[in-house]
Amino acid sequence: MIIRLKDGSEKEYAQPMSVLDIAKDISEGLARNACAGQVNGETVDLRTVVSEDSDLNILTFNDDEGKLAFRHTASHVLAQAVKRLYPEAKLAIGPAIAEGFYYDFDMAPLTREDLDAIEKEMKKVIKENPPIERYELPREEAIAFMKEKEEPYKVELIEDLPEDATISFYKQGDFTDLCAGPHLISVKPIKAFKLTASSGAYWRGNENNKMLTRIYGTAYTKKADLEERLKYLEEIKLRDHNRLGREMELFTTVDVIGQGLPLLLPKGAKIVQTLQRWIEDLEDNEWGYVRTKTPLMAKSDLYKISGHWDHYKDGMFVLGDEENDKEVLALRPMTCPFQYYCYKNTQKSYRDLPYRMSETSTLFRNEDSGEMHGLTRVRQFTISEGHLIIRPDQTNDELKGCLHLAQYCLGVLGVQDDVTYRLSKWDPNNKEKYLGDDEYWETTQDAIRNILVEQGVPFVEAEGEAAFYGPKIDIQAKNVYGKEDTMITIQLDCAIAENFDMYYIDQNGDKQRPYVIHRTSMGCYERTLAWLIEKYAGKFPTWLCPEQVRVLPISEKFADYAEEVNKELKKNGILSTVDNRSEKIGYKIREARLQKLPYMLVVGAQEQETGKVSVRSRFAGDEGQKDLKDFISAICEEIRTKEIRQEVEQ
């Protein structure tokens, strides 16, 4: 048989060979570092036997698929250790994930001390180096095997597999687990690992199921790489918006109010207000939008017309019972059906289009409680939502305009290089989820694809991520832990106008159906705030800071002058306060620095006599004395231009 390798070279063998044996034939060093293989594009164990002409790639830890095999094996070592220490624990699932692995167990919550004990047991397992064996069982035998081991979650997983599925197991010493693999040949290479956290996780991500205990870990081939990763994890914890946002008193959550319902405290609310006012002025004054204000709820009849009732009802908060109540209401998950009636309020001609509507909308989504997280996954949120009613011939220009507006906003926030673009398409194998036929989806997807290509925007395509009514551009960003969220969407909808009988009068006096573009300039303000907290580690650009200047009198004698300075700052629209406490000036400066304020103005006898202020900033440290008018002029220009100044180490 002929084996074609990744570098284009070929190896010829007279008999079947395992992937590991082929790796050894190529190089002993390659065999030592091998984690798995790819045969004709399929990732397999090193123990897999190749018996015919094939393309082969030997995967090491440097390959993504190699890392997955390495860390998946580590998750089994974790499970083996847990079962030794907690025999009553029930196994759920334990996949490899980006930068690590986790395993879910039905067991009591764990402490850091518990994780340390499990780590110690994992080291014992690795030292024992039990042989790893893969084998398969028929469906009924597999179910009986897991029932005998009293593993109900594994039984459920097997029962849910397709009838023709291959059911494989991995055995290492005294531990056996249901698993598709692939795994390492041996656990011996797993020497640099760490259990990083534990948390609750619902079985299969469904809040109606039992809460399990999830243990997270990471593993590397080299101790130095592990230490670097752990150092990085400590650093990103300092940026985690869910921790830092609370420390900075930007938001909080309260159990009695509920999950996914954060309270924006005065500082956080001020940042969001600044963002909202900026976006509203931008849309209204520079991009030709008209503003609407529509209800937070509507009768179910509206959502039946829009399609939400059939395609999105499970994600909505419904008020009332369809069977018993005469009128059933639902909180709005989006604003589009309301704005359609704003459009329909007066007849429009072809000259009136595009008709661009925008609203700062409060929306409600019935997210699973297991999905709730800080400000990024919430049940009530505010969004810069808008809908453009356009003629078909305006599609290209208006899609480009929406994309340019979104990119401009990202640029002002300084995050344009932190995003990726995705063309979210329908799933042709699950057509009941969507409106429209094959031709509709191919046409609309092509329209969006052409815009992205024409604008030179690098993008990926994702099947099954479209809205039920049309494809979209999703602008994606990752949080500090690498989880991707959608920040901004631009969606093309060529079907909904018929549902709402929307039309315009063309140049011949005939009625024509318009298209609709659903879009946001900023996306969800709460999610944007979370993103900015993590991007800037709480050190926001001055124009976004809820407190831009703090005036610090060096003693009570200069409190009146400090108040005069503060009054002048406020007159010029600067967000400023005075620290009139009797603390020492050094303490006040340190505290202001810890609170990440952009500017401190120190005032004492010299400043009072000359009408000046001593300026300290995050950007240049001690900037010396300045005339108050000059400082005000400079900071007002910085705020007006939304400048992002570089920080200096202090």
Mark where each language-model region is.
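NTP/phosphate- and nucleic-acid-binding module
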Residues: 1-73, 77-90, 97-650
